[in-house]
Amino acid sequence: MMAKKSVKKPARRSVTFKLEDAPGRQVFVAGCFSDWQPKHRLTDREGRGVYTVRVLLAPGEYQYKFVVDGEWRLDSANPNFVPNDFGTLNSLLRVTADK
């Protein structure tokens, strides 16, 4: 009988998405990590106009956008972006395995 080899998955890391210029009632982040569904809602916990949410992601590259009241927008604080299949741009996030 052969011994089973266990494949260790890289640990997921907590990533904070932050959007400061979002005068909207519903603020979400969507990307390849959520099948482009706006599942992760950002909240303004302190009432200062700074919306945040934490998402657990494995190391890798992720394309994403913010969705503010149904309008898709780039992350203006992130200078990294790539073209998408719709002729617009997506923000690009690199999550490393470093601690």
Task: Please describe what each predicted stretch is.
Residues 1-3:
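A general sequence property marking short-to-moderate contiguous segments
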Residues 9-61, 71-98:
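Aromatic-rich carbohydrate-binding modules that target alpha-glucans
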